[in-house]
Amino acid sequence: MRCFKATIAYDGAYFLGYAKQPNKLGVQDKIEDALNALGIKSVVIAAGRTDKGVHANNQVLSFHAPKHWNAAKLFYYLAPKLAPHIVLKKLEEKNFHARFDAQKRAYRYLLTKNLKTPFLAPYIACGDYGSLDALNTALKQFTGKHDFSMFKKEGGATTNPKRTIFNAFAYKTFIIGHECVVFKIIGDAFLRSSVRLIIQACVQYSLEKITLAEIQAQIHNLKATIRTPIMANGLYLHRVYY
């Protein structure tokens, strides 16, 4: 068997998350079904398991295929079976583990105050976010190594809630005629819905609905003020570092 590394992008609006689902509406279901149609039976491992509605620009996968498959041939037959909602960007033969070999994951979140067309609604979140300075003040609280037990939803297989965030900041830009705030958070790994809970906390602070002290109390697992993640549609798994 040969091990392959695949880099894909997908539209999370069409899936119930990355992981396999009973109704087969997970990204993993679609990819494994496409491989099965080519006679390849393999579990597909992802660098990160995104939630329902979350997108990916550069998700990384690892899987195995029989030796008669090379990267060029497999790309040719696999890419059309994944389209249009999953795009196979790159495929190479590489002996590695997509999840355990990853060193860092980078997420981006797109948020605008005024969405001018419904056609962008699945891809840019809409809502007030206060001031950019306040957002960045809140984001700085999360850098470093922390126990994120109070910044995760129930579920997930991990038993270690400690994660390191290397960088977290926000900036403004224009995306398809919309002024947006883009949040960028880079960490070694993330717990379930952790990124969206972090961004929700920062937005609520910027809107003066919670204080920095309340954010710090939740980071230190003293009291949970933010329990509901921000909407999923603005979130993208942007890059995985190896």
From Swiss-Prot:
It comes from the Bacteria. Keywords: Isomerase, tRNA processing. One of its GO terms (biological process) is tRNA pseudouridine synthesis. InterPro entries: PsdUridine_synth_cat_dom_sf, PsdUridine_synth_TruA, PsdUridine_synth_TruA_a/b_dom, PsdUridine_synth_TruA_C, TruA/RsuA/RluB/E/F_N. Substrate binds at residue 107. Its EC number is 5.4.99.12. Pfam families: PseudoU_synth_1. The keyword NAD does not apply. The active site is at residue 51. One of its GO terms (molecular function) is tRNA pseudouridine(38-40) synthase activity. Belongs to the tRNA pseudouridine synthase TruA family. Homodimer. This is tRNA pseudouridine synthase A. The gene is truA.
